[in-house]
Structure formats: structure tokens, C-alpha cells
Amino acid sequence: MRIIALVAILAMPFLANAQCVTDSIMPIRGLSIAAPQAKNCDRFVAFIEKELAPRGVNTLILRVDYNYAYKTHPELRNDTTLTEKDVKKIVAVCKKSGIKIVPQINLLGHQSWATKEERLLKVYPQFDETPWVKMPEKYDWPNSDGLYCKSYCPLHPDVHKIVFELIDELTEVFEANDFHAGLDEVFYLGEEKCPRCAGRDKAELFAGEVNLIRNHLAQKNRKLWMWGDRLIDGQQTGMGMWEASMNCTHRAIDLIAKDIFICDWHYERPDKTAIYFAMKGFNVATCVWNKHEVSMLQTQDIIKFRKESSPAMQERFKGIVVTFWGSAESMVDNFDKSAVQDREPTKAFLNVFDYVKRLSKP
């Protein structure tokens, strides 16, 4: 027993040094994933402890949305939800593992999916930016309405009271200092038929909503995180309407607070827009997905940016977030089954974190 204790003590400086090297190379090593279903919470907790923590994950963007038993607005709960007890299990394992939780609710855009509204517009249809656009029985893209996802109207006088109560409750139960508001792929904004938004500048509308959320969080010393696509000019860059904006919201980049954390996602190519955000004064993480060759190039890029930029710029390139767009359960399944390397999103995750770990050896 004494020998084991001595070995553990002697190993501590080595482990601490390895951690310092890892943090220096890649301060944020994140995973963005949907929150698990309540019945699978214990399995997800074990996954964090046995798979994520040993690989060096230190940031977990948890897409909760309406998968929580909100007390402030129980009418907005999904049919089955995580309870406070479930959440505290996730909080406990993340604290133990040194993992920062950033809970997420999709705000402004992504208020519907395919044929159904999400809970906010289903319960409060008056918040809909485009009430004349009806949800289809069968969803196809493209379509005559340009419907990808619905948005709430950012100028509706009653929407923010509800949204802010959800934010407060979720950040408190997760004991979180940061909150992710989504804010990606907002196509419906400033519509001509909207009695409040018609004729308004879309960049100003978008910036106004972003700053409003940011300012609310700042009252309790919390920080806003968001996806960066609406802040990129899709026409000038050739990046198009998904990974960038084609409806003029890109000008909002000069209208929003600089302490907002940008999650800069690109999945088809290793586009270098992290440099753009850093030059504008934002802290930024590059977000990758399922093309593991692209993911590796993006990981190498962010390391290179940190090495080769000015001291001021170096500190703005914060790291990598791997995004997983299936259910939490499907990612856990990938680790439980053989031939995990053939599952592309998980392969990208493993490659990125194994690469950073190899570089971190002192």
C-alpha cells in the first residue's frame, strides 16, 4: 500500500505538467452534444467519467433546449425530461472531471424542425416571426416558403420575459457561468409581413437580440456563447447560406459586445474564419464535425494560429469543439460497440483528442 501511495505521489508532478502542456496547446477541448434522455442519464454520466474525461475533454456544450423539467415554465417541458436530480448527477461528474458545462437553448432561430414547432412556438404561437408560414405535413427542402426553421420575433414585447426565465433556471441548475444561445441558421428575420420587424435593418435586429441576451447574462456575471455563422458574409466569402449569412446579418459583427464567445463551425472545408473573429476582438473556438480529415486540418490550424500569431491574437484562439448531431445515446453506443472507428463523427472525435493528447506529452 505504501509503495502504491509513493508511486502516486511521484506521478503527480508529471501529470500536472502534462495538463499544463495540454492547456497551453489547446485551452478549450470541447464536445457539443444533445442532453441525454432521463432514462439514460446514468449511462451518460458513466460515459463522461470513463470516456470524455480520460481523453482530456474540459468543456461540454450540452444542448438541453426543452429537455428539462422547468419549474418557471412547466408548460414548455418536453413530454419526458431531465429532472433536477438528473442534472445534478451530470454536474457532479463534470466537477469531479474538471469539465466546464455550457448549457444551451436555441434562441431566435431553430424554433421548429421539419414538420413541427418546438415548444416555445407551440405553446406561444404569438411569438412566431412568420405565422403565415404553416408547418407542412411532409417536409422537403427547398420549399416555396423558404422554411428551414422558424424564428421567434425578437421585438415581441412578451418573449424575453419567458426566455430569460428559462436561461436563469437552466444556468442555475447546471451551476454554469456560461450559456450557449445557439443563434445559428436564422433565415426568418425582419420579415416584411411582421408588424414589428418590417423595414428594419436585419443586422441591427440580429445584433439587438444578441446583445439583449448577453446583457441579461452579464447581470449575473455570466458569459454568452453563440455559433458564428450569422456573422460571416456568405456572398463575399462564397460560404453560402448555411455556414454564413446571405441576409445581411453579417454586419452585426461590429455591433455586438466583444466578450461574446464565438463557436465558429465549418464542416466541408477547414475555412480559416477563426482568424476573422479573433481580428475582430472575439475569443473563438473552431467547431468540427464528421469529416475526420477536415477535422484534423482544423485542429492543426488552431494550434498553428496560437503559435504564430501576435500575443494578443494568440489568446483569442481558444481551441476546438467537436460537434455531435445525433442523440447522446447514439454517441455512447458508438463507444460501447466494436468498430467504433467506422462511425465518422465519433472517429473525428477520437482523432482530434488523440492528436492533442500526443502533442501534450512533456
List PLM regions with ranges:
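Catalytic-core regions of glycoside hydrolase
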Residues: 173, 195-355
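Bacterial Sec-dependent N-terminal signal peptides
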Residues: 1-21
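Intrinsically disordered, low-complexity segments enriched in glycine/proline and serine/threonine
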Residues: 5, 15, 107-109, 283
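N-terminal hydrophobic targeting/anchoring segments and the immediately downstream early-domain regions
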Residues: 19-50, 54-55, 59, 126, ...
